[in-house]
Amino acid sequence: MNLFHLAIPVDDLAAAREFYGAVLGCPEGRSSETWIDFDFHGHQLVVHKAPRSAIHRNPVDGDSVPVPHFGLVMDWAGWEALGARIRQAGLAFEMEPHVRFAGKPGEQGTFFLFDPAGNALEFKAMRNPGNLFAKQA
């Protein structure tokens, strides 16, 4: 089994614990005074106490996308449910849930938000999951 591992900087471990654990529903694994492991939908996400980094932006299908960012490709129902959960928690979207690449092989629902440390996350769902790596026609 191959799992993805990602380590990101956060400037407040308690805020990260609330965001990733309580809001996004990621179970917590090991931790210390300077880092916390989370089960990010079957992958290992580690938040390390560190200073904030700069965010840059790139254009994608008319949107200004924050870079760097990471996230998850979900099924459509799970994507909609997570969007509702984020709204219910009173968090602001950086980019509201919407569909991009409409009518193309890469059609997808997407939304972006920032964690409390300013890390950008994207959650998306492919209209046709088999087209995740399809080239645009």
Predicted segments with their positions:
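A short local loop/turn or secondary-structure capping micro-motif enriched for an aromatic residue
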Residues: 46-47, 53-57, 129-132
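Short, conserved charged micro-motifs
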Residues: 15-16, 77-82
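N-terminal beta-strand motif that seeds the catalytic metal site of vicinal oxygen chelate
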Residues: 1-14, 70, 74, 125-137
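Short glycine-enriched loop/turn motifs at secondary-structure junctions
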Residues: 1-2, 63-67, 104-105
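Short beta-strand micro-motifs in enzyme catalytic cores
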Residues: 34-36, 68, 107-111
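Helix-adjacent hinge/juxtasegments
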Residues: 59-75
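Core segments of cupin and vicinal oxygen chelate
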Residues: 9-52
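Vicinal oxygen chelate
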Residues: 83-84, 89-137
